[in-house]
Design a protein with these regions (language model features):
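A cross-kingdom feature marking charged/low-complexity
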Residues: 39, 44-67
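Short, well-ordered alpha-helical segments
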Residues: 2-36
């Protein structure tokens, strides 16, 4: 029987949602092993004064198997 743990984190990217998710998973995997999946809870954007998108932000939960 395995036990999993869930952590919540935020990540951002100037390129898009997918890049923000990849960045968050990449940073998490540097210290967290056995990552099994992620849930995107929230997507936000930061805008410039003219309304154009400056940055994409995601809040996500990552689950991993505890040794």
């Amino acid at each position: 029987m395995s036990v999993t743990k869930v952590i919540e984190l935020s990540a951002s990217s100037e390129r898009g949602i997918e890049d923000a998710v990849k960045h968050g998973l990449g940073k998490a995997s540097a210290t967290v092993k056995n990552i099994k999946g992620a849930w995107i809870n929230e997507i936000k954007v930061a805008t410039n004064d003219d309304g154009s998108i400056r940055e994409w932000r995601v809040n996500m939960r990552i689950n991993f198997v505890v040794d």
